[in-house]
Amino acid sequence: MSGNTLGTLFTVTTFGESHGPAIGCVIDGCPPGMSLAEADIQLELDRRKPGTSRHVTQRQEEDKVEILSGVFEGKTTGAPIALLIRNTDQRSKDYGNIADTFRPGHADYTYWQKFGIRDYRGGGRSSARLTAPTVAAGAVAKKWLREKFGTEIRGYMAALGEIDVPFIDWQFVRENPFFVPNADVVPQLEAYMDALRKDGDSIGARINVVASGVPVGLGEPLFDRLDADIAHAMMGINAVKGVEIGAGFASVAQRGSVHGDELTPEGFVGNHAGGVLGGISTGQDITVSIAIKPTSSIRTPRRSIDKNGQPAVVETFGRHDPCVGIRATPIAEAMLALVLIDHALRHRAQCGDVVVGTPKIAASAP
């Protein structure tokens, strides 16, 4: 299994399984001298951790992070930073009925066919539990980007199933368990999730992420374009089935006279490009939207096969998120931060001394 590392200069390698003793990651390439404590990382992990409301998995994990290396006297040393999160609430007996069968929509079948062995307990390596180390690494990236450039990365749930959530204000995002920017819609979402749980079913979601204060120039054409690497990273999140940058698929119906964001001495007029032109950041907000499929582990009986290829009926009894998207906002923020810090370091390495006479224009014209 060779696809466990993200990044070029700022790399993150995750390890562990859902029901193993621990999960974690090793960060390599973090610049030295940045103040870093476990509390800085814990703030982000607490936003993602399970068991925080009745609408998510009831697995009770504190997700307490331990910094094992790479930090001395409260500052990063430039050495690899090892982060450990111990699993404390595994309940592997819940998965005995799927040891020899495959859940429809899950990685069970493909992991078995590819590796010839699979850890069926909670999905093993394919579990969304493995997004916790990603969020931990993202906390480190967020801190560096914020201190270096003033970059702010924020996300919110834009849709839950067929319910679209109108954007009202960022302040509401941190005040509800759905990460929605609209307090008025929360009761509707709660009723929807309560009914879904009674049905033993699941649903998908749409998450929007915005990075403000990103410097112009990040991205490495042709094949390491910034938007390409963002899409690559976002598709690495469990259950993500679609990614949009800027106007995304709406660009199909837009004329060039509308989609092309005009430039004026006062700044850009519009941001249909999502802050990326030619694979390079423009200095505008980076806007990303991801589509998350319904959770595969549900109580509804479904047809499948067993390891011998014989018909089987699968019903999952473990503790699962009826909508993975409810806890996906900090995960998507972390992924965007990891891509941005990697490209910031790559830009500094090759083009840090480049100076042109053309002034950098504002992200948005007044």
Swiss-Prot record:
Binding site for NADP(+): 48, 54
GO MF terms held by the record: chorismate synthase activity; FMN binding
Catalytic activity: 5-O-(1-carboxyvinyl)-3-phosphoshikimate = chorismate + phosphate
Pathway entry: Metabolic intermediate biosynthesis; chorismate biosynthesis; chorismate from D-erythrose 4-phosphate and phosphoenolpyruvate: step 7/7
Cofactor: FMNH2
Cofactor note: Reduced FMN (FMNH(2)).
Top-rank lineage group of the source organism: Bacteria
Class in the EC hierarchy, top level: lyase
GO cellular component: cytosol
Keyword Chloroplast: no
Keywords assigned by UniProt, alphabetized: Amino-acid biosynthesis, Aromatic amino acid biosynthesis, FAD, Flavoprotein, FMN, Lyase, NADP
Amino-acid positions noted as binding FMN in the UniProt annotation, renumbered to this chain: 125-127, 238-239, 278, 293-297, 319
GO biological process: amino acid biosynthetic process; aromatic amino acid family biosynthetic process; chorismate biosynthetic process
EC numbers, comma separated: 4.2.3.5
Pfam families associated with the record: Chorismate_synt
HAMAP family assigned to the protein according to its UniProt record, in alphabetical order: Chorismate_synth
Purpose: This reaction introduces a second double bond into the aromatic ring system.
Subunit annotation: Homotetramer.
Similarity comment: family membership: Belongs to the chorismate synthase family.
Protein name: Chorismate synthase
Organism of this sequence: Paraburkholderia phymatum (strain DSM 17167 / CIP 108236 / LMG 21445 / STM815) (Burkholderia phymatum)
Native organism taxonomy: Bacteria, Pseudomonadati, Pseudomonadota, Betaproteobacteria, Burkholderiales
Gene responsible for this protein: aroC
